[in-house]
């Protein structure tokens, strides 16, 4: 068995594999190992663009950051992005195909060699590889063509750690049931079990752990407590994304429209941790209320989500609030929705070839097959209404979109990239704005000025200049916290022994 790798497989989706892989990567990095994550296939709308313009899943970006290395699409060679009844397939960072659900099995057969080649390239660069599976590892109906779980472990001869989530209940049955559905050779590959998301006192749980070990004849390597770590989520299945009422009266209230195909919600993680700012995800008029700012985020299917906004009456309510003075802000697909017209004559997004936008910005968007994926340095070139100190602020982020937006005479540039190209506009009064730039709020100076202007307008206490920590420093603190909790509760020495290090 190859002793340079290890693979975390799950009893189900969302058991915490991604977080545990990030934890082990940071633990090993702190011991001076050159370590990299790897996940053959990801299914997520929450993607990232690397320095070389490749698209990859956010989970492997987090794991790369935990490993203190530059993210590479080789770490996640296959990314599936479901949208409008079909799925966009990203291979090694570039659009490969759009497929129907019934085509998955045939696709996997084609991509198996590409996955192995990507793994080999990563393993040649790093001492240790920590792999992650996808969903549950014992889906017997998918087993023959699966390239992300046990077949991947066998392909690269990796020992396996099985991860189970106790918080959802039935943890013992899920572990035993999963192992029983594996073949004898597959079970032999499983060298340990981690029970994740435990609440309560461990001493009361220890007899159950011992009984489990007696049944499965595999050691439980630890019980990971249910603890909050402020790191980017893999997809939108998160407690953060839900309708909320506005909280304290002294908070700036920002309502983010929860779109059906919402993508890249990590754009707002920074806002979530600013004192005196209340972030709400809203999907009905009942919860919209009267916020200080409405943000329409990115989406994998702009036209369909725009139609849903109209059907739910949220579109009308957003327009009314804008007319009464609420700042409306759009990012990527949300930016396109704010315009006058969206044209999709090539059927890039689906079968709707034309849709009127909200009409708040004088832009028209035409979708095409070419997908823009690039990291961007940019600058704010216009202040907004009542937000007077953001002009000339530098921005760093990324673009990831289909479509080109043509700017009309009743809109003015809001953001330009380093080459002078307009990547965001506002109306002439500065009361509505949008941009293609993801990650805009990760630029601390811009966000400090943006939030303080809102606070000043409401006579709230302002943020100090250093109150909003540098994003990279904050993330690093969270990875260290995660690594410590992992080391305190999981038998890292045993994991290293399994890996042969």
Curated annotation (Swiss-Prot):
GO terms for molecular function: ABC-type vitamin B12 transporter activity; catalytic activity. Pathway: Cofactor biosynthesis; adenosylcobalamin biosynthesis. Residues 251-446 form the GATase cobBQ-type domain. The keyword Transcription does not apply. GO terms for biological process: cobalamin biosynthetic process. The keyword Repressor does not apply. The active site is at 332 (nucleophile), 438. Keywords: Cobalamin biosynthesis, Glutamine amidotransferase. It holds the Pfam family CbiA. SUPFAM superfamilies: Class I glutamine amidotransferase-like, P-loop containing nucleoside triphosphate hydrolases. Catalyzes amidations at positions B, D, E, and G on adenosylcobyrinic A,C-diamide. NH(2) groups are provided by glutamine, and one molecule of ATP is hydrogenolyzed for each amidation. Belongs to the CobB/CobQ family. CobQ subfamily. HAMAP family: CobQ (MF_00028). This is Cobyric acid synthase.
